[in-house]
Amino acid sequence: MLILNVNHMNITQGMGVAELIEEMGRSGVLGAGRVHRATKLLRGMIDDLEMAIFMSVAGPLVPGGMRRIIRDLIDDGTISALITSGANLTHDLLEAFGGAHYRDYGFDDEKLHQEGIGRIGDVYTRSEDFEVFESENQEIFSSIFSAKPHISIQELIHEIGGHLDDDMSIIRTAHLRGVPIYAPGLIDSMLGLQLWMYTQDNRICLDAVKDMHSLSDLVFSHERIGAIILGGGLPKHYTLASTLLRGGVDAAVQITMDRSETGSLSGAPLEEAKSWAKAQAGSNLVTVVGDATALFPVILAGALSEL
């Protein structure tokens, strides 16, 4: 058996992200080793012109400062599809309509409620921004559903993008670039609540099953499928399950804070997906344990610096 030494990382003044990632690779173990392997794998996925990359996003990544990163990956053609929660779409729209996300330290939740402020960790939102969100969405829904009362979730998100004028919006950029956004849990969000409110006076059919047709077509139109999985939950499972009929993904990078001992999907190592044919035998898989808002920007910057 070949035993490799663990080399100690050398951090120097003025070093760039690519050098930092290489030092992590010299260590090669624990979190540093995983970050290095994830960076190399992501670069290989981007370089592979025959690979479609699906990006799965769960958790508060848009309010957590990653809106621009996701938007740019769509705009430059890196990803072929985005699978996300309704909450991230909600927060993208909140900013598209002129709202914002705020930061502070220290909080009293009862006082925040009295002041019309909602909290996500140490991220804050204002109720007046959601009031604009509500009125804007009702107008957009009226325009869309008057022409298309029967529509899939992906088609609805695409149509919403056509009504936006914020160039930094994930939804608008996906609309312009023709990149589909899938949100299988859309109803479980403020955007979903607005849809329910619209149906109090209007009859529509939001067809979730129809999304599987376009997603399946996308899966089978590419030689290889890769995945960037940030967080877990429904977006992660929807992403992996979409490749089941082709034997699974060929490569994937996962960043999660969850643990595997309870059998949770969110904490499941990617290798487990092989038993379900959601990852190919011999597929290249890397799981990094940690906060995606801290780790993914570093991994992505490292991958892009080597292109």
Curated annotation (Swiss-Prot):
GO molecular function, one term: deoxyhypusine synthase activity
Cofactors required: NAD(+)
The EC number(s) this enzyme carries: 2.5.1.46
Record-annotated active site: 278 (nucleophile)
Reactions this protein catalyses: [eIF5A protein]-L-lysine + spermidine = [eIF5A protein]-deoxyhypusine + propane-1,3-diamine
GO cellular component: cytoplasm
Pathway note: Protein modification; eIF5A hypusination
Pfam families associated with the record: DS
Top-level lineage group: Archaea
Enzyme superclass (EC): transferase
Family matches, as NCBIfam families: dhys
Function text: Catalyzes the NAD-dependent oxidative cleavage of spermidine and the subsequent transfer of the butylamine moiety of spermidine to the epsilon-amino group of a specific lysine residue of the eIF-5A precursor protein to form the intermediate deoxyhypusine residue.
The family this protein is said to belong to: Belongs to the deoxyhypusine synthase family.
Name the record gives this protein: Probable deoxyhypusine synthase
